[in-house]
């Protein structure tokens, strides 16, 4: 089954393709589709549905969308739904992943409560009357310094996953999938997609 993936993020596509194994994911840009929806929801679920519906309205075919982010207790839940753009408004430009996680560490200097969680909402949009959403989390804390591990992407070098007992960037690829917010949500979604196909 071909699924459009409502994203422009190659890393996310690679990870989601692996997690869903057997389902071909197609990014809009791979078919020359301009896709830049206004993610103006208040929650991860809102934004996943907004992205899925926006792409469905263009392709009229099954769409998968994910919205995820990092919520840090001591920062009032920030960066939250703005994780991907963290610090960019103040900087007036796009920031690299390293610049974002270094900014996060700077903003947490002197803070002892380092509890945080990654949240992932995945929406499967089959039609305007068949929409499914799954949300999962992975709990942990923000490290004091970045790890030298080279696994993962984004904030993985500074996120300690409680279940895994280590920094996410240090986890082997298969292990990350076991503990990550996206891995948990994708496993449930994979089962749901398989059920839908057998209806």
Where are these regions (language model features)?
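Anionic-ligand binding patches
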Residues: 2-4, 11-199
